[in-house]
Amino acid sequence: MGRTNFVKMRFIKIQATVLAAFFALSQFSTHAAPLVPGPNDGRIAYVTARLMEEYHYSQQPLDEEMSKKFFDGYLETLDPRHENFLQADLAEFSHWRTNLDTLTIGARGTADLTPAFQIYERFVERLQQHDAYVAELLKRDKFKFTGDDKILIDRRHSPYPKNLEAAKKLWDERLRYEYLQEKLSKEISPTNDAILPLPKNADAKIVDTLTHHYNWNFHMVTNWDSTDVLQAYLEALTHAYDPHSDYFNTEHAQDFSIDMSLSLFGIGAQLGEDDGYCTINSLIRGGPADKSNQLHEKDRIVAVAQGSKAAVSVVDMELGKVVQLIRGPKGTQVRLTISPMEDRALRKIVTLTRDEIKLEDSEAKARLIELPDGKGGTNRIGYIDLPSFYATIDLPGSSNHSVKSTTADVTKLINKLKQEKVAGIIIDLRTNPGGSLEEAVRFTGLFIKDGPVVLARNPDGEISKDNDPDPSVLYAGPLVIMINRFSASAAEIAAAALQDYGRALVVGDTSTFGKGTVQDLNPLRPFWPALSAATNDPGTVKITIRKFYRVSGASTQLKGVVPNIILPDVLNYSPDIGEASLENPLPWDTIPSASYDKLNLVQPYVTQLRERSDARVATNQDFIYIRQDIAEFKKLQADETATLNEHEALTERQTNEARQKARDKERSARKAPDEKIYAITVENAGESSLPAPEALTTTNYIATTNGIAFNVDSDFSKYFETNAASKNLKAKIRTEVKTLPPDPMLNETENILEDYISLMKKSDTLIANH
């Protein structure tokens, strides 16, 4: 498996920001007059900096050293692949590198934003040069891929090009690589592994594809306004303190609230971009768009109007800005000018009343699983997929959402599983990024008596405890928690507490993400008394204010939670996942342990459970495939280049395709799983009967997210009206998961839980007999 290996590329893609590919062609090679800061932008930057100095956990002043991190971070935000800025640009801007502190907080009350806007304008200038050069290459070059050239895929740690000639060499390599990838995708037969002859117009189609791609991406960058520049600049400032502090303008703050609340006020549509048009990808069931019966998938939105006001054209508008126009307070009207899929020349106006949209795909869900017991009967176990620790959060000026609570939803699901007499429960926290700390504490309290769940230390060194105040226990049976390298923050708190108490067995990757910090939201308006109520919202600053610790006293920062049983996974070998891979993380440390009543429900069985699991994993065919992928991934990690030789690349891709098809063939020949799965949702958990069992095939076990987070491109432009990338990623994962292979992690965890139940029963029998 070579440089075209998908596993490699999916890791590269997830790291790169959308800006990494924002180059252009001549269609958008002109740039409007230079941007200037908005009237309040300097004040916003000043207040943000002062809040970071005052409230951040590190208590670090914005000094010369922080200025260096601030400056470097801004360049990284704009040009993460180090292929547009020249070393001459860096030399020209170098006097700012140690002076951003003075420019930001030196003047009383207002920051000097000259560096932010001049650096951005230089970036656009370099993109225009990139534009002209790529356009020239596509017009005149007949690309040949017969030599031994290679391209360094990940340039994050490489120096910026020395001069324009060096930059052109990088641009040429990148374009040739992208051209080759397009060509390869057209050369392999979709039905077998044969190499197909290219059609006569193939080169022209590839040029058209790349032209459109570059045009659109460049347009998105040069379409920035002053708020976009300020957003990027203040992100660099806050990230200089740690990777989780942030500045949110109004749009980003709303997205954060929606992520936490799992609801928004809008029309209920999933939107995407297609050739410069905002396109309806799907309708959310029960939303205003769905109920209107006037909107359909693939319809284009060409203009948006608020109530009776004039319509605003949204053709070629950045998708996030279209989203902002469509969202609005509950009960208000929005008029959409639609170009229907069946007749693009037609224009029709659809008036919708905004309503609250529930994002049910992101809430907790359960499955009742019936497994054969080997004696002619069945064992019943429960499975709960918890994508995040969500909770209602209202920002100043926002309308009240209906109350949403992770703990309340999980309680309903567990009560239903208990009603169905499950012998044990699996809770899946894989790819759970965290969320509400309060919800994580309350969730943990469902499984333990009262006591501390998490410790926290503030900047003054004061240690506090977040306790479960409720002595009742909702579920006292066998419990297994699944984690992976993407389980973070509040998910780590819950997993760590249940592990420290000896209440749950933790299974999964080598460790969780390692985010052991707590953030607080600080709207800027209260710090700005003179700001008129009619003035646009100045934004919100998210600040890391505490570090949290396990009840054992160890931090989860950097090191994460190590499971009781580790399963093989390619994710275990990526250095680019986890807190340690981010810029400016806070260090790991310990504090004194809390006093808590430790249970002994796990440790007596861990050795036997691990031995049995290891024996199964050693011979399980899916884990054999995973170990093969791990070996290939290690080879890829050792060589970060990709070949530009067509024959070599095509052979590699053909080999990879053949390997995957052989695996698919082997899997399809397997006997269908001898189990029944019943889907339980928050909505149907209160019903007395179970729904019909799900149809199962050899390639469709339970839909979960483990190991497939990289099966989507980080540059995809599908948005719910939330425009929230993490949720879109999960939504796309969940819609595609049914075509993926079985989830061996979950299947093995089911086996582990069955062993755990059996061992606990034997132990109870021995105690009873004694």
Would you name each region that the model predicts?
Residues 15-27:
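Bacterial N-terminal signal peptides
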Residues 62-68, 72-150, 218-273, 333-335, ...:
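Extended, small/polar residue-biased N-terminal targeting/export presequences
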Residues 32-37, 50-63, 214, 219-226, ...:
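Cleft-lining beta-strand/loop regions that shape enzyme active-site pockets
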Residues 76-77, 98, 109-112, 116-132, ...:
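PDZ/PDZ-like domain segments forming the peptide/carboxylate-binding groove
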Residues 490, 502, 507-577:
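Polar, glycine-rich mid-to-C-terminal structural blocks
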Residues 1-12:
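N-terminal secretory signal peptides that target proteins for export/translocation
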Residues 153, 177, 181-192, 200-212, ...:
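Conserved functional hotspot residues or short segments at active or partner-binding sites
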Residues 41-49, 63-75, 82, 90, ...:
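Extracytoplasmic/secreted envelope proteins and their assembly/folding machinery
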